[in-house]
């Protein structure tokens, strides 16, 4: 099992939680971004810089992920693709995407995108909060508790 992070838009506080979990549980963790990332020195944590371009980091994650891996992403289409491959997807606000909820999330995302394309002001997500950070940490801990210790 490996953790993959769609790192371009992942909040720094979430990356810090992931770094601590990777060290504590000794889980290989890979951050993928189209920009240079600083990661703590660790044999469990690495960063991969991909070329700039639309969904290049997403494509790399989809190509590399295997069943049972965990992908941290707020990108709903990416979450859908990794779930199809048998991996798990967790967003930075602590919501685990599943086969039961991903289709609804994707439909809502597409609907909102259509509204924005039509000129409707839809607003964005709420500011990232301490409650979001705690929800992510709790969900990550629950997920990792199910994985045998290395």
From Swiss-Prot:
CDD domains: PIN_YqxD-like. Pfam families: DUF188 (PF02639). Belongs to the UPF0178 family. This is UPF0178 protein Daro_2879. It comes from Dechloromonas aromatica (strain RCB).
């Amino acid at each position: 099992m490996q953790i993959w992070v769609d790192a371009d838009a992942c909040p720094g506080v979430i990356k810090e939680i992931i770094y601590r979990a990777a060290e504590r549980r000794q889980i290989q963790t890979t951050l993928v971004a189209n920009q240079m990332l600083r990661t703590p020195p660790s044999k469990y944590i690495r960063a991969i810089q991909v070329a700039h371009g639309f969904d290049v980091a997403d494509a790399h994650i989809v190509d590399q992920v295997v069943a049972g891996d965990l992908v941290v992403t707020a990108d709903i289409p990416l979450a859908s693709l990794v779930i199809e491959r048998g991996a798990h997807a967790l967003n930075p606000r602590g919501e685990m995407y599943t086969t039961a909820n991903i289709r609804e999330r994707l439909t809502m995302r597409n609907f909102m995108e259509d509204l924005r394309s039509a000129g409707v002001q839809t607003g964005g997500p709420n500011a990232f909060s301490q409650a979001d950070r705690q929800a992510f940490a709790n969900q990550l801990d629950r997920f990792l508790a199910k994985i045998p210790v290395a």
